[in-house]
Amino acid sequence: MAAIYLSRGFFSREPICPFEEKTKVERMVEDYLASGYQDSVTFDDVAVDFTPEEWALLDTTEKYLYRDVMLENYMNLASVEWEIQPRTKRSSLQQGFLKNQIFSGIQMTRGYSGWKLCDCKNCGEVFREQFCLKTHMRVQNGGNTSEGNCYGKDTLSVHKEASTGQELSKFNPCGKVFTLTPGLAVHLEVLNARQPYKCKECGKGFKYFASLDNHMGIHTDEKLCEFQEYGRAVTASSHLKQCVAVHTGKKSKKTKKCGKSFTNFSQLYAPVKTHKGEKSFECKECGRSFRNSSCLNDHIQIHTGIKPHKCTYCGKAFTRSTQLTEHVRTHTGIKPYECKECGQAFAQYSGLSIHIRSHSGKKPYQCKECGKAFTTSTSLIQHTRIHTGEKPYECVECGKTFITSSRRSKHLKTHSGEKPFVCKICGKAFLYSSRLNVHLRTHTGEKPFVCKECGKAFAVSSRLSRHERIHTGEKPYECKDMSVTI
């Protein structure tokens, strides 16, 4: 075997192992490298072999360390030896792989077992499957896909150096040469774990050549597939199939649940998720259904009365942590959601969403009884209880019932006498934060609610609503005894 002159410093490197104390593998490797090989170093000199029993004694970190050190040694020695080979040897080595053992080494690595190996005659690049080679040749030679060879397990070329008997193994994608089959196997494993297909234009790496091929269309504007109907060109055949489907109206993908058809699988997946999202978790108390168990568990707390999330300011408890977070903002005054139209801020995003509809005038939820429209579905539900007379929320203190839970909550404070919201200017206390906000406008003079008809401004929205009835002539309140509207 040809010997290569290498100094000890060639192998100097930072410690791989995170331990302060060197492991037995690291010490063994350093012993090999520091044992006086000043004249020459061969592959056998730096190779550390373990018996199966010895290998079983190593932990995971030591095995990875062994792999890293051996890989570096193999790559360093191989690259140096490759450079000093005579030109005649180099040309003969470029013809293919050596020995059937090389194929066994490739099978040891992840991602290469069971495939044919195909190489390009022009650049020598190796591909795992023939279609990858054809795609590569199409890009390189403008459509000619004949300049390539494919090798199976039984057709790997065998070459022996008659003069020295030396056998070198070359893996074409990166040009590395190895004397030992295990060195090639370890090298292939690391190479496969990375992204071996690099774009020559921008340097971006890809795990599969097909991905690189599609990416190259960005730089070259190359359109390999063309739709004959109107001449549109696309970069991949899959895009062409979807393009044809759009113009022909062909919908080949069908969901089994409802029979609806789609042009591609991405469109098919959306309704499947809808079918999977059926509300299958049902509350045994009230029969209401939910999409998942977590929503059902939150709902059950309404029936049990458990409220684990407590406000540190006023002691109010909530069933969900999100409700507590929104409630705390009533104490801190934080309103992170601001309207871009008028600048009004809100403590909750839902409040901002509802407010935005006031600018557009959109009221998508309409009462079937009286035709009145609302901006939110909850407002419509609460309104329908006026017609039905339903009041599901009862006060545990006095038995009074309410249409909404918020009205019951406000009512409960009348029993406790608690007024947690205090004006910092005059010290007046209020039961509700909304009333404190209205009160503060008496100090600031702010009147944010403006009539669109006459321009008159009001501090409270309810007063604006009452004023607007002067212009519209609306009289929503009817006396049942006298049949008079007010």
From Swiss-Prot:
GO terms for biological process: regulation of transcription by RNA polymerase II. InterPro entries: KRAB, KRAB_dom_sf, Znf_C2H2_sf, Znf_C2H2_type. Pfam families: KRAB (PF01352), zf-C2H2 (PF00096). There is a cross-link at K273, K424 (Glycyl lysine isopeptide (Lys-Gly) (interchain with G-Cter in SUMO2)). GO terms for molecular function: DNA-binding transcription factor activity, RNA polymerase II-specific; RNA polymerase II cis-regulatory region sequence-specific DNA binding; zinc ion binding. Keywords: DNA-binding, Isopeptide bond, Metal-binding, Nucleus, Repeat, Transcription, Transcription regulation, Ubl conjugation, Zinc, Zinc-finger. It comes from the Eukaryota. Its main location: nucleus. GO terms for cellular component: nucleus. Residues 41-112 form the KRAB domain. This is Zinc finger protein 561. It comes from Homo sapiens (Human).
